[in-house]
Amino acid sequence: MEKEAFMEKLLSFMKEEAYKPLTVQELEEMLNITEAEEFKELVKALVALEEKGLIVRTRSDRYGIPEKMNLIKGKISAHAKGFAFLLPEDTSLSDVFIPPNELNTAMNGDIVMVRLNSQSSGSRQEGTVIRILERAIQRVVGTYTETRNFGFVIPDDKKITSDIFIPKNGKNGAAEGHKVVVKLTSYPEGRMNAEGEVETILGHKNDPGIDILSVIHKHGLPGEFPADAMEQASSTPDTIDEKDLKDRRDLRDQVIVTIDGADAKDLDDAVTVTKLDDGSYKLGVHIADVSHYVTENSPIDKEALERGTSVYLVDRVIPMIPHRLSNGICSLNPKVDRLTLSCEMTINSQGQVTEHEIFQSVIKTTERMTYSDVNKILVDDDEELKQKYEPLVPMFKDMERLAQILRDKRMDRGAVDFDFKEAKVLVDDEGAVKDVVIRERSVAEKLIEEFMLVANETVAEHFHWMNVPFIYRIHEEPNAEKLQKFLEFVTTFGYVVKGTAGNIHPRALQSILDAVRDRPEETVISTVMLRSMKQAKYDPQSLGHFGLSTEFYTHFTSPIRRYPDLIVHRLIRTYLINGKVDEATQEKWAERLPDIAEHTSSMERRAVDAERETDDLKKAEYMLDKIGEEFDGMISSVTNFGMFVELPNTIEGLVHVSFMTDDYYRFDEQHFAMIGERTGNVFRIGDEITVKVVDVNKDERNIDFEIVGMKGTPRRPRELDSSRSRKRGKPARKRVQSTNTPVSPAPSEEKGEWFTKPKKKKKKRGFQNAPKQKRKKKK
């Protein structure tokens, strides 16, 4: 019997209900093994299954499956404060809390086996790492520091809670303060730290651009394109050829425009709207036909799959495909011929798509419009711009009306519409931050989002009913346990949600967002709600999108910057244009799509993490020269160690309780408030106060505030010293650890899936707050 087949047989045997852990000899007897060769195969299979974590050997040398032995296999998600959670491989199981002393040298991302502890505190399941099956971290980015005989690297990733020991012969030219990439040569063992050698010196930590370069290396973001991909890009023509037009619908005589940001270079979507005689609208969404140029398994395609998505950092874009294509032949630049895939829809006055057609086309856009100019035409009634674009103004007004119809329909069905502010960090040519401003979101931005949403839904539904292998954008229903915590949380503010944690419609959550709109608690309730939900991801199954409250959704509209969109285009070409729906074709895609969906979802999360980190880094840098300055802000979160205050430009800092010196403040957990025991002063979420910047740590991305008007010295230092033991039994070095975990509004889940807009609040001065009466429940 082949090894794989024997392993499968052995695993099936152990999964039987009557099975109890057995020794090798007992298994030999139970499986009627008589030949020496068969016994060798049994031992090899047991070793292989144990290495994969599929079975476990007990101290008495008995073998069984983890689930029957109070064990769970999963991935470690570490926290900067030393503890971690196990994310079980079986997604139906809840996360398991791992205390710091129970990690047993496991690091963030490691695949481990955890034994559940019978005496877990409260309702939270706790566990102990008993075996590390697979190490995740091979390289670490950090700051090099040295002593006389050795060096060490302080990791940028605070989830790695111990420094990396660098022997003298492993520093490879690194000097004090250098940002370096370290290759690990051994992992933590007992009281000894991980050991490594310097592989790359990025530069001194204070050199321009090194901060962002460190983030790029930390997250493993790609650099230059491979030579074969660049060669393919160079050989791609700059203009379309007559032969490219075969079997394409010619739309070059239509009035079609792109509407994007003023600095956008990769224009992958164009739109047109016509009002029909019966009151319906004809909407054309035309997307750059990237799949025509990036063919399957070509060098660019392989690299695009690996990258998964373009990454938009504050000072640069790391593109998914080479700029020669993304900014050139694939970009729908004005007044030039471009190949597209089109989705034309007829939409009635209720926002229903009554007819649609998906086809390949060629277009020539009439104008390259900006959000700013369209907003000035539609919102500000700018006469100069109306005159400049006079032939287009009626279409823009039709677009505005159609977008409102589509939005009304989406909200009526219960889509969850978050209302977070979103910031944009402006930097100079050297990467130094100039300003942090709020991204304006007005009519033009929203109408494009509505058009992209309806096109994505229409394409998804079309292929759902074709019943062929496809890739969808899904957003599953929230985890009942997390949602239950949110429902309990909102009751402290007097709100009651219709439905239960196990059975809730998105409309019920939207009703809460409507109720808190422009109220002090809006930000924190929206944030906690968002965090109670699952992340949207890609999947071969059409499972619907909870947040958008739609049964069918995919990503069709951005093939320049998202690989799943490119796959959707490839499938449109395969199934619709080439008519290949045979069994072999479907089997091929049914086999490939699960891996593509999983990988691109992972690459999307990597990109979001890197983008968020560079934003936070530059926000802290922006505040470095603001120490001593005063700002108006709003309390965005209250914890037992202080209050987080958000400034109007979304920058957030901590007022540590030790800086609240006019009284002794206690944390009222039920009402998320700080209450002065002597004065009765109350600080709660949503209160507007004036703060002074007292400290900024760019490396830790921490900003410290104090409340203006509170005099005196802090009662105790904010920073808590914690020791990190050094390898080889060297004395521990004291490290300053952050004690805060900011509750910040998350950036939009992705363009088009959540809306954001700034909001205005009444200002409350200083710390002289009278206690508020208890809020009444919403009816």
UniProtKB/Swiss-Prot annotation:
Gene Ontology MF term list: exoribonuclease II activity; RNA binding
Single Gene Ontology BP annotation: mRNA catabolic process
Factors inducing expression: Constitutively expressed, part of a 5 gene operon with multiple promoters. Not ethanol-stress induced.
Residue ranges constituting the RNB domain according to the UniProt record: 248-577
Residue ranges of the region described as Disordered: 709-779
Residues in S1 motif domain copies: 628-708
Entries under Gene3D superfamilies matching the protein: Nucleic acid-binding proteins (2.40.50.140)
Protein family (similarity comment): Belongs to the RNR ribonuclease family. RNase R subfamily.
Protein name, per record: Ribonuclease R
Organism encoding this protein: Bacillus subtilis (strain 168)
